[in-house]
Amino acid sequence: MEDPIIHFYETFLSEYDPKLRKARGVWYTPQPVVTFIVRAVDDILKTEFNLPRGLADTSKIKKKVELQGTKGKHEKEFHRVQILDPATGTGTFLTEVVKQIYKTFEGQQGIWSNYVEMHLLPRLNGFELLMASYAMAHLKLNLLLTETGFKPTSNQQRLRVFLTNSLEEYHPHTGTLFASWLSNEADEANLIKRDVPVMCVIGNPPYSVSSAN
């Protein structure tokens, strides 16, 4: 059966709004290509960066970040292997990252949920410009995590996939015309752009000779 996410990109969007598709350079990345890229990144982390667990690494580093509303800085702890897909689309690359990491937990299902909350969600980041793709990325990731047996606690973090333009630099919140929810999305994305020491940028950014991105 054809993946409905693929159907959205390849059929629906091309018929519903071909101009938007062309203007934004939106094209679906074939699954074999996605799998190859994710496995390659995992292998490079192991062989070139001396991280035996690759994408599943849980080590942390410290970095000085700005305090909100002040000019001062404080030291904050981050996971070393921070992952970012700057053009998330429907979440194809991020879901493949989850699948790659999940393979390393074969026979350790009992610790998977804790790992997801403590060491996966805090470092899996995505930016997406189009609302429909953003919504489907959240749906796709949530469905996959449920399929893996992930059982969230009452303190579950949200998925760190945000509706934002990756090419916009961090800028302080101005509190102008945005609705509250959209303002929060922008604020959260800005913090990632400003503070998070991203180690792995992975994905397939949209391309068009005349792209409006």
Predicted segments — roles?
Residues P4-N213:
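SAM-dependent methyltransferase catalytic region
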